[in-house]
């Protein structure tokens, strides 16, 4: 019997998340999808458990791991947060190892994915993906559309590196098992680089199959203070 059948799906009211300014996006560049002729090595997926007890202080997950170790959280909440730390680390490495199978597994079929393209004026090359009068264009993508484009990005780049900082876990105030995770992300590939704020809405109600319902990204240059960073309270969940 499929245990997920007893879990009610999360419905996200999409008309509440798109803002007039400072739109959340997933950063992608049009020219980043052009093929790279370098041969790609196949990589085996390896889901692992991070030992939070031995985590170094410079690890981006250290502050949140310390809350779990302190023993002041409810047992179920602590277990969920421990799982989030493991899954977020594997999510990060799934981009660097081009593990499209893992991404296909964790994104909900109804995931809200807002895709952004950084459009630069001719002759400009910003180090962080947005600069001066550069613009970001936006469009909604289905899971299928997003992963198909991501496969093109993986094929076009020999190396992709993703680093996290300012990692925070937010528990939904009324829906058990629903968590928001925000972090600052630095993305670097052969053809493109950017820095911005990433938000992920995780559903851990079925522990055998955690799902991502939302992923958003905001260019760092467009955020003036912490209040403008997308968080769990920016979504109406039903």
Language model features by range: what are they?
Residues 15, 23, 42-44, 53, ...:
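Low-complexity, intrinsically disordered terminal/linker segments enriched in charged
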Residues 1-9:
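Signal peptide processing junction and immediate N-terminal pro/mature segment
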Residues 100, 160, 207-209:
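Loop/turn elements at helix/coil->beta-strand transitions in domains of secreted/extracellular proteins
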Residues 3, 15-16:
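Coil residues (strongly favoring Ser/Thr
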